[in-house]
């Protein structure tokens, strides 16, 4: 098979990230230098981001049967690379005083980013599985990166075992789907799916097993049990990556699969997904209420956010609006999560053992770091879906999709879940403005706003506010990113 120059241009982000992985690996082998390797990783990711401009010029195309490069894949590639860049930026000051090998961190983040880019373009179950494994395997190492602490090691072991189990479910599900349909391409699957999936027991069993695998990767109830422990045990920059890049890439490819192969047309599949969505919304929010650890709280809240997003997946028949909803919601979720985890990373840097993760550490933050407290407030309000923030635009879209598709019970659950969520987000926000404790346990550096991580956090806060008040640029961008058949 010959690859034309056009196809090479279409694959630029993938090739650049892959090349950066090799360069960083050789650089580590030659000489360990934290600054040099961090710079190489960030430069490589920035080049991959800029290369999207040339990919856009090349136009939509199928590069091999495994990958479809179009505006949709470019949008999700961009989000994954932004999340990876933020992870590297937050990790640099944290790793500066880390007592063990530091350089491999960037290597693992780059390999996971490569997996995310593969997922964004996947149009075949084989590339979907390769992408998911590429994103999951480095995370085993990243979650346990602070292995001197028992909690980080425990989180890594939990994540490794459960992730391996989920991958085997996913693979077995794909095998059954292949046994029934004889195809692994998304489009070909769509052609072999009849409206009466119920009468195709092999296909139904395969879809069920795949939903279990995806449910674990997206931490949906009842496959969510690892989430709070792993978010708490992983270093703050890794929790950032887990909450953003891996969720966004996997949900992006799941959305494409459901559009090309309309599984949600089957009443049985819709009912199962609906039950998972409602359980995730309510359970995620109810469990977050009792948390006194901010990383656990954000872990439970991510379960609820993915539950809201499932509404758009179930209503995938009203395609245009559904795809628009997922794009806007995930962009809002990305910037809100980057800001929230960014503040935790800034408070936890440089490395001093456990992260600054108890809510008590943030009590009275406003009185000595007012701008940082204001940023955290904006992020909490956005995650809660308060008007004037980007989070509100996403929630509004989700409810609009639910109403449009007549999914009344799901729309009711979104409203109820958001109301419960308001309580713990506001509890976190209020504690920032209480009188500070006599002795400050943890604090961010005084010049945090002039560090690279501080700049990322401030840009996220500005984007959340500006796009919350005037969302048209984002909506136009998401409309451009409609997948072409």
Swiss-Prot record:
Native source organism of the sequence: Erwinia tasmaniensis (strain DSM 17950 / CFBP 7177 / CIP 109463 / NCPPB 4357 / Et1/99)
Name of the protein this chain belongs to: NADH-quinone oxidoreductase subunit N
InterPro entries (UniProt xref): NADH-Q_OxRdtase_suN/2 (IPR010096), ND/Mrp_TM (IPR001750)
Reaction equations catalysed: a quinone + NADH + 5 H(+)(in) = a quinol + NAD(+) + 4 H(+)(out)
PANTHER family associated with the record: NADH DEHYDROGENASE
GO biological process: ATP synthesis coupled electron transport
GO cellular component: plasma membrane
EC number(s) stated in the UniProt entry for this protein: 7.1.1.-
Function: NDH-1 shuttles electrons from NADH, via FMN and iron-sulfur (Fe-S) centers, to quinones in the respiratory chain. The immediate electron acceptor for the enzyme in this species is believed to be ubiquinone. Couples the redox reaction to proton translocation (for every two electrons transferred, four hydrogen ions are translocated across the cytoplasmic membrane), and thus conserves the redox energy in a proton gradient.
Family: Belongs to the complex I subunit 2 family.
A GO MF term: NADH dehydrogenase (ubiquinone) activity
Uppermost EC category: translocase
Parts of the chain that traverse the membrane: 8-28, 35-55, 75-95, 105-125, 127-147, 159-179, 203-223, 235-255, 271-291, 297-317, 326-346, 373-393, 408-427, 449-469
Keyword Transmembrane appears in the UniProt entry: yes
Pfam short name (any one): Proton_antipo_M
Membrane topology: Multi-pass membrane protein
Entry's localization field: Cell inner membrane
Top-level taxonomy: Bacteria, Pseudomonadati, Pseudomonadota, Gammaproteobacteria, Enterobacterales
Keyword list, A-Z: Cell inner membrane, Cell membrane, Membrane, NAD, Quinone, Translocase, Transmembrane, Transmembrane helix, Transport, Ubiquinone
Keyword Ligase: no
Assembly description: NDH-1 is composed of 13 different subunits. Subunits NuoA, H, J, K, L, M, N constitute the membrane sector of the complex.
């Amino acid at each position: 098979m010959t690859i034309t120059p056009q196809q090479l241009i279409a694959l630029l982000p993938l090739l650049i990230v892959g090349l950066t992985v090799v360069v960083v690996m050789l650089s580590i082998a030659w000489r360990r230098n934290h600054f040099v390797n961090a710079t190489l990783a960030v430069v490589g990711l920035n080049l991959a981001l800029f290369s999207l401009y040339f990919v856009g010029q090349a136009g939509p195309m199928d590069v091999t049967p495994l990958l479809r490069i179009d505006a949709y894949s470019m949008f999700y590639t961009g989000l994954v690379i932004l999340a990876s860049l933020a992870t590297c930026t937050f990790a640099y000051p944290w790793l500066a005083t880390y007592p063990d090998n530091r350089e491999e961190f960037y290597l693992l983040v780059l390999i996971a980013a490569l997996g995310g880019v593969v997922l964004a373009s996947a149009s075949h179950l084989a590339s979907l599985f390769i992408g998911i494994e590429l994103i999951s395997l480095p995370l085993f190492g990243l979650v346990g990166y602070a292995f001197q602490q028992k909690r980080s090691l425990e989180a890594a072991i939990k994540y490794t075992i459960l992730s391996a189990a989920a991958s085997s479910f996913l693979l077995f599900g794909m095998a059954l789907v292949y046994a029934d349909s004889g195809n692994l391409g998304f489009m070909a699957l769509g052609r072999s799916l009849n409206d009466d999936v119920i009468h195709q027991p092999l296909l139904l069993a395969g879809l069920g097993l795949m939903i279990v695998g995806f449910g674990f990767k997206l931490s949906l109830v009842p496959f969510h049990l690892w989430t709070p422990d792993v978010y708490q045990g992983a270093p703050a920059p890794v929790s950032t990556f887990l909450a953003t890049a891996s969720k966004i890439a996997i949900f992006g490819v799941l959305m494409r699969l459901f559009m090309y192969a309309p599984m949600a047309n089957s009443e049985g599949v819709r009912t199962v997904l609906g039950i998972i969505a409602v359980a995730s919304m309510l359970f995620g929010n109810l469990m977050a209420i009792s948390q006194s650890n901010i990383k656990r709280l954000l872990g439970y809240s991510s379960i609820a956010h993915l539950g809201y997003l499932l509404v758009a997946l179930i209503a995938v028949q009203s395609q245009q609006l559904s795809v628009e909803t997922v794009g806007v919601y995930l962009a809002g979720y990305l910037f809100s999560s980057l800001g929230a985890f960014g503040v935790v990373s800034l408070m936890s840097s440089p490395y001093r053992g456990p992260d600054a993760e108890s809510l008590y550490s943030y009590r009275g933050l406003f009185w000595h770091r007012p701008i940082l407290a204001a940023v955290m407030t904006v992020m909490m309000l956005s995650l809660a879906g308060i008007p004037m923030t980007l989070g509100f635009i996403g929630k509004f879209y989700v409810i609009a999709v639910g109403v449009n598709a007549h999914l009344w019970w799901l729309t009711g659950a979104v409203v109820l879940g958001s109301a419960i969520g308001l309580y713990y987000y506001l509890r976190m926000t209020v504690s920032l403005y209480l009188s500070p404790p006599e002795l400050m346990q943890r604090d961010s550096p005084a010049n945090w706003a002039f560090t690279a991580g501080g700049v990322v956090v401030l840009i996220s806060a500005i984007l959340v506010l500006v796009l919350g008040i005037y969302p048209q640029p984002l909506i136009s961008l998401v409309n451009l990113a409609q997948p072409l058949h």
